[in-house]
């Protein structure tokens, strides 16, 4: 009688599936505005004056995965500062947001910032300042609130 490879394949398959399921992360739940206001280093409102994006290898997802993220560099003209020091009305402020671009195999996980504003949108952003990289990052996933299209001024 020849030994069968099927039991070994089944064990390998179940083990691989269990490992992937154990290491899979879930989407991040939206935070209430009160919690973001309390935890943020800066909270500002402004008009989006520039938005640039690029796709790069993911810093969020790792492992047996082909993962690319779309990184957005968003520049605001600050119209109001609700919290934080070092930013004044009228100052330009650049922040970084991201969304997944490619995931193979498709797995659940963080979905980045939702929504990402368009050029000209009025937004309120709840930010965390990273001292090391000197960059601002909105809370994930809902640290960017679109207040509306730009207001017309006379």
Where are the regions a protein language model picked out?
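Bacterial N-terminal signal peptides that target proteins for export
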Residues: 2-12
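Transition segments tied to proteolytic processing and entry into folded domains
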Residues: 4, 19-154
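Bacterial N-terminal signal peptides
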Residues: 11-21
